[in-house]
Amino acid sequence: MRHRKSGKQLNRNSSHRQAMFANMMVSLFHHERIVTTLPKAKELRRFAEPMITLAKEATVAKRRLAFSRLRDRQAVVKLFDDLGPHYLARPGGYLRIVKYGFRAGDNAPLAIVELVDRQTAAAE
């Protein structure tokens, strides 16, 4: 029975899912914008938004917790030095998910996941 199980399975086992979302978060924090399938994008929000909330208070313990989830030093540095202070006044809703059409090979629905008020938007 499915009682009290949250989150989508996405046809992956738990370790694959955990690694996939960690990699997606690293890419999102590094590039501030990624393209993925719509179900993955909606599920990624459950993991990425609490990480940005975690980065608002830059303590050593929170950095270690973020590193244990991301396993990427550069992503943790950018998260705590750039993104955390940037979103200090915002109480949540750090990500924007925009539908992006369908993938050519299998017609899967695509979505753009980007940080709201991202810093590199002015450069584009």
Swiss-Prot record:
InterPro entries: Ribosomal_bL17, Ribosomal_bL17_CS, Ribosomal_bL17_sf. GO terms for biological process: translation. One of its GO terms (cellular component) is cytosolic large ribosomal subunit. Keywords: Ribonucleoprotein, Ribosomal protein. The keyword DNA-binding does not apply. It comes from the Bacteria. GO terms for molecular function: structural constituent of ribosome. Pfam families: Ribosomal_L17. Belongs to the bacterial ribosomal protein bL17 family. NCBIfam families: L17. PANTHER family: LARGE RIBOSOMAL SUBUNIT PROTEIN BL17M (PTHR14413:SF16), RIBOSOMAL PROTEIN L17 (PTHR14413). Part of the 50S ribosomal subunit. Contacts protein L32. This is Large ribosomal subunit protein bL17. The gene is rplQ.
